Structure formats: C-alpha cells, structure tokens
Amino acid sequence: MNFKHRSFFKLGILLALFIINNSCKTTSINDGFYPIFNGENLEGWSGDSTYWSVKDGVLIGEVTPEIILKRNSFIIYEKEQPSNFELKLQYRISKNGNSGVNYRSEKIKNKPFALKGYQSDIDGKNRYTGQNYEEKKRTTLAYIGEKVIIETMPDSILLTNIRKNVKRNCWQTRNITASLGNKKELTTHIKDNDWNTMHIIINESRMQHYVNGILMSDVTDLDAKNRMIKGYIGVQVHTGPPMKVEYKNIRLKIIS
C-alpha cells in the first residue's frame, strides 16, 4: 500500500469512528428522556423548604434533630401528571433513611405536600427498597422479589373503608404469580450510602421497579376501584429518626 492509499485508509477509519461516536451521542440525546429537575433550584417542584434544598446539582431531603417530621412530606413535580412513562434517577440515602418515589399519586386535601399513591420504596437498610407500596392507601402491593397481580377489591368492602382489606401492612387481594429472586440476593445489588440508579416503568396496569438494573418488583393492578391511571410524581422524607436522602439526574420519558 503506497503513502497515498495509506492516507485515504486512515482517513476512512477516522471518518467511520466519527460517525459511530456521533451516532452513539445522538442515540443518548434522542432516547426520549428529558430532565424534570434542573439541578439548580426547585423550579417546577413544590415542597417544604424546611426539609428540601438543592446543592451541587443534587436535590436534598434532610431531617435533623431540630426539625423532626410529624408526618411524611413530599416534594412534588408540578408540571405534569403522567400516565404511561419511564422514570430514571439516581439516589443516595443515609443508613437510617426512609424515602420513596411516588407516581400516579394525588394530593391529600388540607395536608400540604402530602401524596397518596404508588411508591417505589427506598430505605437505607434495604428492607423495602424497590417494593411497591401504595402510600396512604392499599399499603404493600408487592414485596421485593415478587411479581403480583392485584385483583378487584371485593364488593363487600366499601371504598371508604379499604383498610379492612389490609393485614400486617399488606393488601390482601393480591396473587403472587412468580418469584423474581431471593430478597437477600436481590438486595446485594444495592450499594449502601452510595449512588444507586432507580428505573421505574409504568405502562397501562403494569408497574416495574428496577434498582441498578435489577427488577425488584412487578405489579399488574387490575383493581379498577382503587387503581390510579395518572397522577403526580414526588419524592419523600419520612417520619422517624434524622435522615438524609439525595436525588439527581431525574429524567422522564412519556410512553405513548
């Protein structure tokens, strides 16, 4: 191969690498996800500034001995109430922390910054992280490692008294259809006091919670009396001991 041909060959390789590199970047940019937290302030969100702040691109929820919570408090994304979507974020939580990511949730009247609805649970000891817990409503729908179908609530139970269908903080009209794995093994994939990635996929009646790429719970909600088909997204600080939870890179993708 002469010098001229070698030059064209090298140029061809460089051009191919450039195209591949830019193709990867385009895929990343056009993956359908967009940020809903700007990393600078609380624009688009509402919450109690006693507990929520922004620093270095991170949304921080903190409870100190001086400002102990009397009830759970959320910071709520106000700009939209999505129905079918994917939500990706990174979180870090202290050992005694208790938090969660709510979605398809509704505001509770006369209680500022309170939500009721589906939640992908998060706690520092990883007893509940990734399970599906319905805040202020049907309680636990699926524990870690469960694939569950929620059946319609019996007609004998009134909507005003759904707690009648709850035992030991767990909804009773549910069928475990498969195991996603052993809870102890699944939670080994969660890093303590470090950044983890949560990916929530909500499509029609199905809700899947992933942590660091591992499916922790999978719920299909067929309970037309109680299920929500759209609602607010929010993240929580929980009653209990002093705690700190941090969120960053919160991104949403609408599923059409």
Q: Model-derived features: where do they sit?
A:
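Bacterial Sec-dependent N-terminal signal peptides
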Residues: 1-29
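Carbohydrate-interacting regions of secretory-pathway proteins
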Residues: 24-256
